[in-house]
């Protein structure tokens, strides 16, 4: 690790910094055998990048086959041996994803209204109640 010049800082009256007693050789890992630790982004950076990525895109985010299995499983409760056109399943998936995106937008607004940045189940419940979906 390269040494950098320290800039003077105004004292805030706390404890004085401890003196470094370890020698330079003991502190530094050997240049040839040192293992470089992987680069990590600061918390939130990757999340914001993902938000921008998914807001730009229009592709479906739920995998097609698991969604199709879910649709068939739910349809079994109403009538057995139902068949679906592939376009019908895609239309259902498009509608389901649009509904979920809208619900999460409203949920986020509920969390922000409560002066939080983390969404919670109570935010989803409030959003659905305001929408009139759940009395």
Swiss-Prot record:
Q: Where is this region: Disordered?
A: 1-40
Q: What is this protein called?
A: Histone H3 type 2
Q: Which residues form a coiled coil?
A: none
Localization, UniProt = Nucleus; Chromosome
Q: How does it assemble?
A: The nucleosome is a histone octamer containing two molecules each of H2A, H2B, H3 and H4 assembled in one H3-H4 heterotetramer and two H2A-H2B heterodimers. The octamer wraps approximately 147 bp of DNA.
Which of the residues bear the PTM N6-methyllysine?
5, 10, 28, 36-37
Output the Pfam families linked to this UniProt entry: Histone
* Database matches in SUPFAM superfamilies: Histone-fold
